[in-house]
Amino acid sequence: MADPPFGFGLPGGSGGSGGGGGSGGSGGSGGGSGDNPGGNPLGPLGDPQQFADALRQFADLMAWQGGAVNWDLAKNVARQTVAAEGDPSVLDADRKKIVEAVQLADLWLNEVTSFPSGVRTAQAWSRSEWVEATLPVWTTLCDPIAEKAVDALGGMISGNPEDMAGEMPAELSSALQAVTGGLGGMAGLGGGLGAMMKRIGGMMVGGQTGAAVGGLAREVVSSTDVGLPLGPEGVAALLPAGVADFGQGLSVSAEEIRIFLAMREAAHHRLFAHVPWLRSRLLAAVEDYARGITVDASALREAMPQIDPSNPEALREALSDASLFQPEDTPQQKAALARLETLLALVEGWVATVVDDAAGDRLPQAGALAEAIRRRRASGGPSERTFAALVGLELRPRMLREAGTLWADLTEARGIEPRDALWAHPDLLPTADDLANPDSFLRGATELDISDLEEGPTTEEGPATEEGPTTEDQDPGPA
């Protein structure tokens, strides 16, 4: 993998603590291990008052009972990451503009797709609200690999505590012996230390993932910007701050940008709402691939002697090493990756096609905005960075273009309803080979008898109805 899994990279790149800042190597800020005239058993870990404060915070974090990863901490770190660069509340005027843009966009989409509206309510979110609304899905996606990292950390202490002490940095071993009453105390604790290390690992992974989600919140423009259904069903949401950032450097009016991005958001919701299998299949493809990633516990164990306990970023840096996380080279893993990449390309290609058709002559700069989306993806936008970090998947711009071209050609060859009817079952959709060589698929789609599907898509409750965003859209969104 070229990148560590999502949430495991160091926030802000390599400029974090890097070489340890002022920690001073193994001596840390408290001086060398041999310079401890007061006999403070905590040594480089700080003075007693600082350590007492740290212990209180540590106890609060260790009280987490929600699973392997501390997701409460992840949410707090994500919100702090967003707030660090400013995250003002959404003004009522901006909220009204977003709601009106989604309503208009949804109306235009009625003419270019057989899928009815998938939007029950339209909202404008701050970046912190995006974090709150999407974190439940991130929890589902990140748990498989995060739990493996936490288990690997706990497994380092599952053996002989005396051996473990010899592998740890001297300062960390001394501190643990001081707390537990020497090696005998450590041996007595046994599995208790392993459980504690898992809790610590859960805190570190939660903090890392929170920083990654917070960083992503500063880049996205909507709830579906990364290509996954991250937000609540039926809630179309745009981030006014993200929309404004997207428009920087474009000679396009703010209103036109807002409507164009609202069309992309509403188009995603139509697909996710009226293709019952799509949401679960997309998320399952990510989870399946993540489950096939293994953590190299031996490499993590080898890194432990170099970790400086006085540097709080040291364990984070160890976890950010991409070499620790390796995908299994199995047919099942390759198949999961291919399914995910193809399905993401098909979703993006369909959205791009219907948005281009709906914009038509209504938005004079629709072509320029579509090109801006393509450039954003080619240079590594939120979607590309998310999947590169989450599962090591680099979305290929060529496949995205091929998918858009195929959907456009299908529209011309067969019309809107037969094109959309292909979403009735995953086996009807183009494969990766079809995207690369579309002619045979286009001929097959033309000859395929799908008359029983051409009456239009249905929901699980019965025939789909035309329904747009409601007046509930004045709801301020997630708390």
Question: What do the predicted segments below correspond to?
Answer:
Residues 243-263:
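Short pre-active-site segment immediately N-terminal to the catalytic Zn-binding motif
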Residues 257-276, 407:
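Active-site recognition of the HExxH zinc-binding catalytic motif
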Residues 203-224, 272-324, 335-362:
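Post-HExxH zinc-binding segment in Zn-dependent metallohydrolases
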Residues 1-159, 414-479:
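N-terminal low-structure segments adjacent to metalloprotease catalytic domains
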Residues 326-479:
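Pan-zinc metallopeptidase signature
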Residues 228-244, 312-330:
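A short mid-domain helix/strand-loop element embedded in enzyme catalytic domains
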Residues 78, 83-96, 100, 217, ...:
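An N-terminal structural lobe/cap that precedes and organizes the functional/catalytic core
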Residues 98-241:
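Auxiliary, metal-adjacent structural segments of Zn-dependent hydrolase domains
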